Amino acid sequence: MKQGFDHRKYLTIQSEHIKKRIAQFGDKLYLEFGGKLFDDHHASRVLPGFQPDSKLQMLLQLRDEAEIIMVISAYDIEKNKIRGDLGITYDEDVLRLRGEFENIGLYVSGVVITHYNGQSSADAYRNRLERIGIKVYYHYTIDGYPHNVQLIDSDEGFGRNDYIQTTRPLVVVTAPGPGSGKMAVCLSQLYNEHKRGIKAGYAKFETFPVWNLPLKHPINVAYEAATADLNDVNMIDPLHLEAYGEVTVNYNRDIEIFPVLNAIFEGIYGENPYKSPTDMGVNMIGFCMSDEEVCSNAARDEIIRRHYDALNRYALGADNEHEVNKIALIMKQAKLTTDYRRTTVAARERKEQWDCPAAAIELEDGTIIKAGSSELLGPSAALILNATKHLAGIPHEVKLIPQSMIEPIQRTKVSFLHGRNPRLHTDEVLVALSLLSTTDENCRRALDQLPKFDGCQVHSTVMLSEVDRKIFKKLGIGLTCDPIKK
């Protein structure tokens, strides 16, 4: 995969910039960490070269100076809110993340339960955490938050919250998902630190939108497509423009909330150290692109991927018509159609030629490989075989898996497992190749090509099964599907 982002440069300049921000405030910096620390696949897709755990690796540069506070809303505990990408509840994800952080040497000092007003489910969760030695703090709901500044900046507002004991100069505040109350936790701590005579500051780490790229840069447009369900909108930061005469990009929620933050800061310190939402940020990603065109093309692919993802969920019954329409509008404004994705055009051509479900993959060198479904194989399984043969230099007419092996597998699927689709999926094809590779040199060579799929793009003219989707994801393949059920 062509690289467009300098990962090593990012680790260096991002950690150094955070150190400078800590020094700006004196004793302590509360850093609100938006987005995902682990598995940031959106960033890795639009910035080829950015690793899914790049932000985590960056924090490891600061491990001796940093501690982590996990935040979870009592509302999310009560309704068992699910993290969509992992399929686990937020309360379980807090424990998962804590374990992941500590396994790599990062210190987690506690968990804050926000929006607390006596929920029994929150009390039970607190007891569960305390039994395994985790410090837990309650932060209460505040009437009129965030606009009732007089109450917020008082002993009945932030002063009512549990004071979180911290010991290190950098306090990273993170959560399983949005709406958990990370910013309020940071501001509450500023209030309570100030009362104790401790100089503390606040900064915000948001990967997107990238503040020093143009508003309509494909990377920023891709972020808008990714958050279409939240109705986020990228905007020119008018406060930054007024203060410095410099055009920067932020998103609507931060711009809308800034006057309130300004009043809260003034209530705590007497003045606001920041003149704009952009000032609050510490993101240095925009300085680390090594090939902007590679990143721009990847971002365009991501916009189209989001378009198909929304259409697929809508076809499966999701109530997301607004999201579908918004992404369609984003594509129109970006003068982007699905034909930009070469695999889409190729897969549809094969479908028309053979009158069957089809799929196509674009390899790293730009080669397009196509496949259609047959009585033996689904389109994705056939595509894996065709692509590995091409990469291994095996003639197309060579059959890697003999029909005599496929047919017994089909019989088991239908006769004994009561399946309706006898065709082999990608996982079944890969298992068959693995078994044959011990005696068949072609199968061994074909399997050895699998790492070359990382970063490749695939389009299918039908929606694939969950099994096939997971295999493509594990191989690092970017998948899109027409919203048509098999």
Model-derived segments and their meaning:
Residues S180-G181:
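Conserved glycine(s) of the Walker
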Residues E349-L377:
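Feature captures eukaryotic membrane-trafficking machinery centered on endolysosomal pathways
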Residues H390-P422:
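Short HxH-centered metal-ligating active-site micro-motif
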Residues P176-G177:
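P-loop (Walker A) phosphate-binding loop of NTP-binding proteins
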Residues L376-A392:
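A short, polar/charged loop-to-alpha-helix boundary motif
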